[in-house]
């Protein structure tokens, strides 16, 4: 069992089970990730592994990162991510994490950036109820009160108001793996996943 892997969302389609029911699925291209650093409670205060993903030419990487990658014999990565692990001793610098570490039926936690939908009002963004549409009402889609007057005399931080909808970090829990292709480095997961095609997804195994 592996800690996790990073991949790119390909898109959605549907497959059919033995009973003929259509199941919506998402395809993820998960190229091998390399272990670039091993963190332990003794040295860093917690147990985790750092992996590199999205290969990049060394000429396009800063000198400090090049020195960091030389320790694990890496050819170069553009991005890095961490996965918490219970036993970091089982990993070695330079180890490759591939789709072969996952199995059909395994439940994983998928994190990505949701699709940005621009500026939106309260009803679309926060599911507020609208006001009366007739009988002389002038409050159709207004937000209503946003706080009291003299006390506190300000709008509390975090007040639900109109603003940027989407483009936020989103996590899908208990997403089930339905198919694993070791040759093509593809995972097929049940249901939808955050973001649009080519979005980077963090797939973490349930501990």
From Swiss-Prot:
Its keywords, alphabetically, are:
Chloroplast, Plastid, Ribonucleoprotein, Ribosomal protein, RNA-binding, rRNA-binding
Q: Does the keyword DNA repair apply?
A: no
Q: Which InterPro entries match?
A: Ribosomal_uL3, Ribosomal_uL3_bac/org-type, Transl_B-barrel_sf
Which stretch is the leader sequence?
none
**Where is the protein localized?**
Plastid, Chloroplast
GO MF terms on file? rRNA binding; structural constituent of ribosome
Keyword flag Ribosomal protein: yes
Family to which this protein belongs: Belongs to the universal ribosomal protein uL3 family.
NCBIfam families, alphabetized: L3_bact
The name under which this protein is listed is Large ribosomal subunit protein uL3c
> Organism source for this protein?
Emiliania huxleyi (Coccolithophore)
């Amino acid at each position: 069992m592996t800690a996790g892997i990073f991949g790119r969302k390909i898109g959605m389609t549907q497959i059919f089970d033995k009973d003929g029911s259509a199941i919506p699925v998402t395809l993820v291209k998960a190229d091998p990730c390399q272990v670039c650093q091993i963190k332990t409670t003794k040295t860093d205060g917690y147990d985790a592994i750092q992996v590199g993903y999205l290969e990049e030419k060394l000429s396009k990487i800063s000198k400090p990162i090049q020195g960091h990658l030389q320790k694990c014999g890496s050819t170069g990565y553009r991005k890095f991510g961490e996965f918490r692990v219970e036993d970091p001793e089982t990993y070695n610098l330079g180890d490759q994490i591939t789709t072969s570490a996952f199995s059909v039926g395994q439940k994983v936690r998928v994190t990505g950036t949701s699709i940005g939908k621009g500026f939106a009002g309260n009803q679309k963004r926060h599911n507020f109820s609208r006001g009366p549409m007739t009988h002389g009402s002038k409050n159709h889609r207004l937000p209503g009160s946003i706080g009291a007057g003299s006390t506190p005399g300000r709008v509390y931080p975090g007040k639900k108001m109109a603003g940027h909808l989407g483009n936020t970090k989103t996590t899908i829990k208990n997403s089930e793996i339905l198919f694993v292709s070791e040759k093509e480095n593809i995972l097929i997961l049940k249901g939808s996943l955050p973001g649009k095609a080519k979005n980077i997804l963090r797939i973490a195994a349930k501990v």
